[in-house]
């Protein structure tokens, strides 16, 4: 069963990488089903997105069954938002033997994704889908440049450069200091948060090929 599990997971990520347009679909029934796992909050953060529903469709087409946290695992399955909404890890793939793979989705209609207060986590597989504008392929007389859907499959530890990691950690250390200072107030509440973005320009064809190979090795 473990061999089958990792084989299906590898096939899943290869399929996403080779067919990025599949992550742009509309599956309202799946979206509604996933949203029911998010609680009763009214904000958009408590609702599944079209992007997440598209990924769930791909996962289900690869033979994984949607289950809830605490359900008995009798076959290849997946859990949506295993840690709750607004937290890292969007999907967890699980096998009856107890093996798990954690996945986080990042999606953008341009060439940058939002990290906000988050960061790329070690041994989490990121499915980063975005749209690249092909400025060099613009047709004369047309106002808009061609656009290309791209899906990067990458382990969290393989994303950021050492320079960027050091800068982000320094930033978090400063935020912790600011939040400690904010505790010693009378009536004022101060929030020190991030609104960080990450450029998709890093995700070249060469980067995507190498990161997919590293992910496949991780899944052996």
Please name every model-derived segment.
Residues 1-89, 93-101, 107-220:
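Nucleic-acid endonuclease domains
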